[in-house]
Each structure stands twice: as structure tokens, then as C-alpha cells.
């Protein structure tokens, strides 16, 4: 429970006034202002305090908030839909649909849980997605496009629908001036960032906007870039029981030597329709 004054009085004061004798907490608050202080105050006041019940589940639940609080950036979930041989599309670059309807329904749930949905320029060019999963009345996501060197299609849905003001293009400095001007004129934002640290710089900008959770749904290039930048906090993969072959791999051109390759710990695995869902976090992450 919080122990400082903010928009509301401290929870610890309310607990003490209510005469509660025993408090059970799953985990400590990642906010450095609290971080166990409230529990210490309650113990000092004579209350019985039990900490750690359902700790793993609680830390998973608050992971985006904790990442934003401790690292001042969003929590990045990378979602991939893959064939069993690790392909995100066939040799014609068609990816509709690798996974089945049950998996696609779960993806919608992932989208609804995120503050922002991120894709690369290739996804905008090939698929022209709306990236707008929420029914009316629910909080609306930011839509983030990672631009490469070339222009983006100005007729894309993300620039022309009623939600264009919720679109952010992250581009290297000096990117396509005429294209950037037109996109800004449509109401979207264009953030020009250092090319060599574009994703890291973007993460800081998004943190400053209060964005806590980004779902990344781009293709292999974006997936590889995020991994190389150390910006994959959670990896969600839907495997379809189909073999495709060909060159369109899950990580684009990114590659690592085995001894330094990104490693993950399995957190969840289950069947979703005819597909297999697995959720992983970096092997060094504590949950």
C-alpha cells in the first residue's frame, strides 16, 4: 500500500483508521517513493503483514507499470505469428493468415491490453492496417510506425482515419521532408530521432508521454531491431502447424553467435485452437 500523499491520501493511513489487523500483499510497489515503506509502517504499527502471496502473478500483472517506473520507458511486448519452421510469411511476403481464428482472437486481446501498437514501414506498405482494435468507449491506443529511409504511403489508414492524431511516426532525422510535412498536416506526429539510436530514443519519448505498454507487431526487420536494442521485455509467439520454407525469417537480417544470442525463459505455453501459444521473458528477468 502507498504511504505518501498524492492525488489521494496514503492507503496506509486508511488501513490504520479502519482497524485492519492483517494485511496480505503480493509484491512491493516498484515506485521508489513507496517500495516497501508502507508495509514497514504497518508492521511498526503492530499489524500482521504477509508479503509474497502470488508474487509471480502480481509481478507479471504490473510489469508495464514497473518498467515505466524504474526505467522511464514502456514495457515492450513482441508478438509474432510463425510457421513451425519459423517463417512469418511465404516467399511472396503473404502472411494472411498463418495462424487460425482462435489465435487471431487472442491477438485482439493483446492489443486491447496495450497503450500503443507498433509496426514497421513494411507492414504499413503491405498490409495497410488500421491498428485500431478497441470498441467505442474504451481507451484508445497510440499507433506507432517505425519509418525506414523511404517514404510511407500517404493513403494509409493510420494517416487518414478519424484517429490520425493518435499516430506517431518515428523516423531518422532529416527523413523525407515532403512526406513528413504531409503526414503532420493530416494530424499525425512525426518524431525525428538519431538514426543510430532510434528505438532507444523513441522509448524515452514514449515514456515521457506516459505510455507504459507497447505491443510490437511489425515484421522481421522490426523484431530483429528491437532485440538488438534490448527492447523486448516479453515475447509472445503463436506457432501454426504449417511448413512454409523460404527466406522470410522471424528476425529479418538480425543474427547472433550462439554464445551471445538473446535467451528467454518460458513463462506460459498452451494450445489456442490449432496453434500453439508461448510467452517468454528475457532469461535475466526476475518474475
Please give the residue ranges for each predicted region.
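Zn2+-dependent cytidine deaminase-like catalytic core
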Residues: 1-57, 142, 162-163, 175, ...
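Enzymes that bind and transform nitrogen-containing heteroaromatic metabolites
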Residues: 7, 35-40, 75-287
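Alpha-helix capping at helix-to-loop junctions
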Residues: 44-48, 67, 120
